Amino acid sequence: SKNLKAIAVRGKRQIHVADRQLMSEISKEFSAIVMENPLTRGLYENGTAAAVLGNSAAGILPTKNFHYGEFDRAESISAEAMNEKILVAREGCYACPVRCKRAVKSERYSVEPRFGGPEYETLASFGSLCLIDDIEVIAKANQMCNEYTLDTISTGMTIAFAMECFEANILTKEDTDGIELVFGNKEALLATIEKIAKREGFGNVLAEGSKRASEIIGRGSERFVLTVKGQELPMHDPRGKYSVGLAYALSEKGADHMVAAHDTMIASKDQFSFKEIMPLGILEPEKPTKFSPLKVRTFAYLSMWWSFFNAAGICDFVPVPRSSMSIDDVINALNAFTGWKTSVFEVMKVGERALALARIFNAREGFDAKDDIVPERLHGPLKNGALKGSFLPKEDFMQALQLYYGMMGWTENGIPTKEKLLELGLEWLVEG
């Protein structure tokens, strides 16, 4: 009723640091190794956009609403294209040496650097997913979403859903306010974003997101919806990275690519990222396209590690395996900052506790194992690229979910047991 979308709070007091000298030493050490490590160096040079060409070559770049894994014009929306045509600055969060943020400018589409620049997810969701090959159009779409406070993944996925409906004659120009909503139509993309933001005409339907929009449209459109728990898929195809399928299904808030490390980060003993994550008890790599007890155990450990990041407010692009800050340095930094004497064991339990608490919250709202699924399209084959014919095997996937539940101390229905809650110090949930 108040039309309130958000409350922004900006603190003015300085944050207390328990051991400022030690914290400064750790920060200097990390800053020094950032440019020596290829993972963080790559983030500085090309940002997350570096994933565009690699994922397309690997056959896992979502293309045409996840029908394909390779985009034949990926070069046009790549980091290299951005660097050459529209990049004006490399920026970052306060005091961060990685500086993975892009600032771009385009005279043709009035794109301003103050809105930053498109990340990988945006390049894919407005690019390959919708068959758009114009980096400046994608930058404009990104700016519009930032200005209107729209999520670029869900917006791109919802528009791709509508484009597939249009292609299948479920939607016509009469439905879309005269917009020729076909894959590859650049102006249609921008016009639709505007309509979604202002809830004008057909935009009022798409503003609900693809799942609810499909319920309004009907006519078989539900088969083009790619969501988990109502949230659209990010731009990583689980048919080439099986753990990502588990991440999508298990995330308490719906499909999320930032729940745990992706399979390709730890697929070989020779990888820096694999070597550095071994102290967590991950001693053997596993093929990205394979389900096994080893794969599930690795995912369980890494989901706890990632969950701890969220609890502590640590950027996923700083610690291993995604970047170069070692496990010891993460723990030492946390202790220096807080004055605690914590350990790897304790922070892993913090992550596990947060995961269990989220499951209990969702269970209260009616979510359980029936909701830990991925769209049927992912259980079908990719239609092109290096992984043509690959699919996420449904039976193996469901067995992996059950194994994960067991490893986490959850029931077959995905609910933490009384014993697990007590072990995690969440007895108040049992008593309640």
Question: Where are these predicted regions, by residue range?
Answer:
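Extended C-terminal regions of large enzymes
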Residues: 1-432
